[in-house]
Swiss-Prot record:
PANTHER family: CYTOCHROME C. Cytochrome c2 is found mainly in purple, non-sulfur, photosynthetic bacteria where it functions as the electron donor to the oxidized bacteriochlorophyll in the photophosphorylation pathway. However, it may also have a role in the respiratory chain and is found in some non-photosynthetic bacteria. Keywords: Electron transport, Heme, Iron, Metal-binding, Transport. Heme c binds at C14, C17, H18, M83. This is Cytochrome c2. Binds 1 heme c group covalently per subunit. Belongs to the cytochrome c family. One of its GO terms (molecular function) is heme binding. InterPro entries: Cyt_c-like_dom, Cyt_c-like_dom_sf, Cyt_c_1A/1B. It comes from Agrobacterium tumefaciens (strain II Chrys). Pfam families: Cytochrom_C. Gene3D superfamilies: Cytochrome c-like domain.
Length: 111
């Protein structure tokens, strides 16, 4: 189990490209509200890479474990995706970040 407060601090790196929480909008990357249980490439208001759309079309749904695998090595998990992150190598940081995403992703995106 991760620490939500530490995950919020870890998300600061992500916030350059992603928004989460009440009123979140797509930025360089998609907003992350409702990410758990969302099909990869599944936000109709975001222009995903073909690689991400293909992953979703093949059935990839974001679970905590799938997010962990992706965030640890985005280009390995989904070659050709647009995410600039090289990967998060520390298991504790991944735990905290995923705890924060689960906690915060229940918010609704901006209308």
């Amino acid at each position: 189990e991760g620490d939500v407060a530490k995950g919020e601090a870890a998300f600061k790196r992500c916030s350059a490209c992603h928004a989460i929480g009440e009123g979140a909008k797509n930025k360089v990357g998609p907003q992350l509200n409702g990410i758990i249980g969302r099909t990869a490439g599944g936000d109709p208001d975001y222009n995903y890479s073909n690689a991400m759309k293909k992953a979703g079309g093949e059935g990839l749904v974001w679970t905590p474990q799938e997010l962990r695998d992706f965030l640890s090595a985005p280009k390995k998990k989904i070659p050709g995706n647009k995410m600039a992150l090289a990967g998060i190598s520390k298991p504790e940081e991944l735990d905290n970040l995923i705890a924060y995403l689960i906690f915060s992703a229940s918010s609704k995106p901006a209308z």
